A protein has these predicted regions:
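Structural motif
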Residues: 70-71, 109-118, 160-167, 208-213, ...
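Short loop/turn segments that connect beta-strands within beta-propeller blades
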Residues: 74-78, 121-125, 170-174, 214-218, ...
Length: 262
């Protein structure tokens, strides 16, 4: 579950029963402020018994992080394998060179120093490494992404009153720099992805609000938008397509970026 939410019971479903549902580009349109016009070109139904959190892809498989368990699907939505069910809150994930990195936290509204990055073998989903990043977060380590050998981990909250915070680490998760962005995402940042073609980050709140910001996190470069469903994590499939978590619908949305360069 996202920070600020109480756990709600959902109908448990076997992820192996995933079905795909192709939809017309005109049937579901997510419109936002110029230049953002997102067209949902496809959808996968991904049943979850403890809430979708993160999503990542290597272009051949899709990795879906539920609150306490990681799953691997092919691009048609067929379950390939499932990782171990673990404790603590698991949030955003990112795929890098055969590994899946997950932001993990105690996620306590009163504050906690339990913040880690878990590292999984992308083929088997075996948990192979943990990095302690507890000194750099206070509530919940939420989203995670990667750029040019460095990792960027964002904080999420239980309210809408905090400026967005992103922490940069090197490849060994040694601290590099903190960034404060002049924007207050609802419940903080739930997902972020680096878009190399335009040197921007796309950042998702836990509400319908999202934005793009340049690679230096300069607030004056920020352009915000608004989706028509509550957001979570996202992953770049290719130069034209994002995969966006729609947790409430238990789907993955394939979103065409109408203004994204080839």
């Amino acid at each position: 579950m996202g920070c600020g939410e109480s756990q709600q019971s959902t109908t448990s479903a076997n992820p192996s029963t995933v079905k795909t549902s192709d939809i017309s580009i005109h049937e579901a349109v997510v419109e936002a402020e110029d230049p953002f016009v997102f067209h949902v070109t496809g959808r996968l139904q991904i049943p979850a018994d403890d809430g979708q959190q993160g999503v990542a892809t290597d272009g051949k498989f899709i990795y879906v992080q539920n609150t306490q368990q990681l799953f691997k699907y092919d691009l048609d939505g067929k379950l390939v394998t499932a990782g171990p069910k673990l404790m603590l809150h698991h949030g955003g994930i990112v795929y890098v060179k055969g590994l899946v990195y997950a932001a993990v936290s105690g996620c306590d509204s009163n504050g906690t120093n339990q913040h880690r990055v878990h590292v999984y073998n992308a083929q088997s989903l075996e948990l192979i490494e943990k990095h302690d990043i507890g000194a750099h977060f206070t509530v919940c380590a939420g989203g995670i992404t990667h750029r040019k050998g460095h990792f960027f981990v964002a904080e999420s909250f239980f309210d809408d009153d905090h400026l967005d915070k992103i922490v940069e680490f090197n490849a060994s998760f040694q601290h590099i720099k903190d960034y404060r962005i002049d924007f207050k995402s609802p419940y903080g940042i739930q997902g972020l992805e680096y878009l190399p073609g335009i040197d921007q980050f796309q950042i998702h709140s836990h509400g319908k609000v999202f934005y793009r910001i340049n690679g230096r996190f300069e607030s004056n470069s920020l352009i915000s938008g608004k989706a028509n469903f509550e957001l979570q994590d996202l992953a770049r499939l290719d130069a034209n397509t994002l995969i966006v978590n729609n947790r409430q619908a238990q789907t993955l949305e394939f979103v065409k970026l109408a203004t994204y360069p080839d």
